[in-house]
Each structure stands twice: as C-alpha cells, then as structure tokens.
C-alpha cells in the first residue's frame, strides 16, 4: 500500500496546483479589476477562460489517454501549468492574461479528469476511496496556502496581481519532475495494450511484493465489456482430496471444481438449493425486481445488498477457505492436484510471450509481517461439523477458533490474496469455454443461517462459506485449451476506444450516474462561490468582524477565505477516513442536507437584518459550513464514482464525457455568477443553489449505488448484470 499511496500523492500535486490557482485568481481579480478597469462581463471571461481551456482539452483527453496512456497526459498537464505561470507573470494586457488562463485550463482539465482515473487504476480497492480523496485534500491545501500568500501581499501598499498569478510556476516544477521521473504508467492501461511485463513490474512496485498473480488475472478480465452475466448462490469448500486431471469440473451431484489465480489449492462449490437461498441470491434478485419507489434504480438496491451485513474489515480477516485459489495464472513448476496438466502451459504461452521469467515467485508467501498490510482482506470462514440433520457442532460458533484453524488448513501461516476488498475470482471450464466467477462471502447472519438451515452443504465435517457469485464468460475464450486459450489483450484493445460500447446497457447506466452527478455538483454552485468568495464576504460585511485588527475590507475577506479553507482540511481528513467505511453514497446522503441548511440560513440572514455584526457572522458561518461539508461529500465523490464505474477499455472515453459536462457546468456557473449577483442578489443566487442541492439529494438516493471496497472490474460487471437483468425481467419479477 505504501507504493500506491506515494504514487497517489505525487499525482495529486496537479490538484494542488488547481486549488492554488482557484484561490489566487479569486484574490487577484480584485486587483485586476482596479488595474485594468474591466467591465463585469470581462471579469467573468478572465476567470472562465481556464474553464474553457479545461473543457476543450477534456473533450479529447479521455480517448487520447486510452491511446497514449495516463502518464503522458499528466506530464503534459505539468508542462501547461509551468508555462501558464510564466506567461501570467509577464501579462502586459488582458488578452495575454486570457491566453495564459486558457493554458492554465488545459493543465487543470487534464489533472482533474485523469488523476482520479490514475489513482483508481493503481490503488487497492480497500483504500481506493481514501486515496481518491487526496485530490480534494491537496486542492484545498493549495487554496489555503495561496490565500495565505494573497493575504500577505494584500497588506503591501501596491499588491501585484502578476506576481500572485506567476508564483504558480514554482510548485509546477515539482509536479513536472515527479510526473517525468517518478510516476509509473497505469497497470490497467498497460494490460489493455498487451504490455504484460511492464504491468507486472508496476504492480510489484505498487504492492511492494513479487507475487501479483491475482492482480494480473483481474486486470486481464477487466478488458471484457458486456456479455451475458448471471448470479449464483453457492456453498464453497476447500477440496481436501486429490482430484483427477480431467477438464470436467461438474460431477453428477452438481458439485463444481473451481480453479483460481493462485497456487496449491482447488475448491469445490455447489449451488444452494433454491428454497434455502433467501439470504443471498433471491434477495438480490428481489432487489432488482421489487421496488418500494418506482423511480429508484434497482442497481442501487443490488449494490446495497452486497454491502449489507458484510464481515467487518477490521481485525483478522484472513481466510482458510480461499487461501490459494488453485492457480491458473501462476506458472510455477509444481502444479496443484486436480488441475489439468496443460492448464498452466496455455496461460504461460500468453503471459510469457514477451518475457520468459514471468513466473510468480513461490517465496511470496514468506513475506515478513510488514508485507501483510499489503494484502487484501480475505473471506473469513465458518468451520462446522454437521450431522445428517445439519446441526452444527457446539465449537462451530467460535469465530476466533474458526480463524485460528483457517491457516492450519494450508500448512503455513500465510494466506494468499484475493482480488481485493474480500472478493475472489475463480474459473470453471465448461462446454469448451471458461466461466469466470466473482465471489463474495455473504454477511455474518447469512453465514449463520446457511450453517443451520441449508441442506446439501458439504457432506460430513468440513469448512465452507455461503457466497454469492457473479458469473460470466471469461476472456479465456471458447477455443480449445489445447491451443491458445486466451484472446491477447493487445487484440482486444487494438481498435482503441469503442464508441459502440457506449450502447452497452451497463455502460449507459453508468453514464447516467456519472453525467447526472457531475451536472448537479456544478449547479450546486461550489466553484462559483469559491471563485468569488472574497467579493461575497466583502459584500456580507466581514470587515466588521475584523475591524479591530485594522485590516481593510479586502484583506479581511482574504483572511476569512484562508481560514475557511483551513477549516476544510480537517473535514476532508474525516471524509478520507469514512470514504471506505461508510461509503460514497452514505456520505453524499448525509452531507448534502447540511449544504441545503447552510444555504437556506444564508438566504434568511440576507432577508432579515438583525445587526451588521450578526448578519456578517451568519454569512461567514454559513459559507464555512457549506465549504466544509461540501468537501466531505459532494467535492470528491463525483470524480471518485466516475473513475470507478466504467470498463477499462472505455474508461477514458466515458470519463471525458463526464468531465466535459463538469467543465461546461463550471463555465455556466462561474460566468453567470457576477451577472446573477448584480441582478437577483445573493438571496436569489443561493436560493437557486439550495434548490439544486435538494434535487441532488433525490438523484443520489434514487440513482447512485455504493461502490466502496469493490474491485473496478467487479463494479462494471455488476452494472452490466443489473442493467441486463432489469431489461430482461418481467415487470414484477426477474
């Protein structure tokens, strides 16, 4: 995790520069207006030029990043920041200033669009939300430091707006250095181009270990778009006998053998009888079919069912049920029992076509304790001894004893990795094709119910879990395994972005979520308020609060703005802690009402004049409250969601669409705010923003699913499954 965290920190310097510039232009506009005597419409244009540049670059940044990679686009962003800083330092007139702001928009557009994508593609699922909150934290940190600089310069007799804006070139040099010499390319992008050796090395750097077999398998599977998907309710147990070498993986009793992405084990799974699956599959299908609200998207309930009553992330979450899930992608010499003898040879022919030493090191299981934190939490297991009446042995109730025994099944003290977030991936060969299984253990209550009430579990004693599986055809295609089984990734991605993929049901549903939340975020007014905070606070009378300090109204507004951004930082830290615990959806549903209340109180304080001091205090307090709760939820989460919900092959294209909507909305809000302030005043402006926040809460409740802790590939598959299942289902049932 250390490698992924450092890479995320380096990438988010681009967001630091964006935050720095947002605050700097807000402060510099006061002096630009005085120096150049600009009309109101031109004031908005100076600010909006960076937004125009961001919109222009965003329209092509996604497809280009799918073609050239994420890293080159981040390098270009750093170059744009550096050049625009130098030009703004020189700007002799408003025309040159507007050109510099346009270049600034190019840099900001690339950073805001691609940094969340880059982090999502390099971060483990367990901390992806936390790391993707770093752009908000560094952006707000950049704003705070910039306001400190602007406030200090405002105390001088003749502040220079050119110097304020030109300082941007200094931190942009650090960003340029890190993007060129430190940041690796996204491993998911590398896999999509068939550059398996490079992807493996990057994953090893990010994870801090040699064994990245599971991650490599998952990234290859992520190249798939669409395809038929089903859900199954399974009981899964460790295979404790030597299997044969045949490819048949289903016996006459319906018991399946699953091979996975790691070495030394295979597993047996059998479907849970339909009458006993109410805790798992049936409830999830019901979540798609039976809606308490007509307009509520069934996907919201489907995703929610995956997070209900899940095992806690803390504590010892290692598993004995999925310690070394077979090995399909490992190429070590010792093949596990029960696996087809030529299985690994077929996979090796693909993975090693450019590098003969791709084989996973067996020593990965002997890593020291410092490496344990790099491993994803695995399924906890239930160990039970059942008689013919399915009554559990008294000792089966001890979770502690169950987990203590979990490592004994393997003969060592280490568990292998899943694919992240407690998810696991298995494979079954059937009818000349491979089936891929994404497995997730049901919650504690579901497991307890399965032990007591599900007949047909593993006969006799044994260990098993009650798991739900999302099943689809693997990219290990329908060819004979005696030949080349895998469709090479470079052939899958050779055609570049697939515009036709935008018509896939899952992609369309994800676009509705991504575009909708980006539009509503902008029309909640945050960027307009940020750009014009000094003017807004000055009009609200904040100089009264700081008159005893002998500050001018302009300096006082800068100081209040700086203090506001300072208070935002601990709020973002709280959001970082909660992003992978409470989840994205929950944070939005809890923070948006606070935005509404703060805007309503701000409107009331403008309508009812108590005293100048009280009104100034209310206005300032509401602005601070609005900012703090915005950066906890509505600030980072739209970009986080958009970077998670699209398939790898079209992620750049879909992100470009969402980002273009983001920047167009930003332009409209920013350019219209000065006009609105002069026509309908603060009361009208913030009344509109409050109404949009109400609409936003309804949209989140109805349409936005929870994605915390889920691998990107699993998220996109569930979008596809949910959309397909709903489309093919009768109106009342699936």
UniProtKB/Swiss-Prot annotation:
Tissue: Mostly expressed in juvenile and adult leaves, to a lower extent, in flower tissues, and, at low levels, in roots and stems.
Subcellular location field: Vacuole membrane
Region (Disordered): 351-403
Keywords, comma-separated and alphabetical: Membrane, Phosphoprotein, Sugar transport, Transmembrane, Transmembrane helix, Transport, Vacuole
Transmembrane segments: 6-26, 44-64, 79-99, 102-122, 133-153, 163-183, 510-530, 556-576, 588-608, 621-641, 653-673, 680-700
Location of Phosphoserine modifications: 446, 480
Post-translational modifications: Phosphorylated by VIK; this activation promotes carrier activity.
PROSITE patterns according to UniProt: MFS, SUGAR_TRANSPORT_1, SUGAR_TRANSPORT_2
Family, as annotated: Belongs to the major facilitator superfamily. Sugar transporter (TC 2.A.1.1) family.
Its biological purpose: Sugar proton-coupled antiporter which contributes to vacuolar sugar import (e.g. monosaccharides including glucose, sucrose and fructose), particularly during stress responses (e.g. in response to cold). Required for cytosolic glucose homeostasis.
Subunit comment: Binds to VIK at the tonoplast.
Protein name (record): Monosaccharide-sensing protein 1
Classification lineage: Eukaryota, Viridiplantae, Streptophyta, Embryophyta, Tracheophyta
Gene: MSSP1
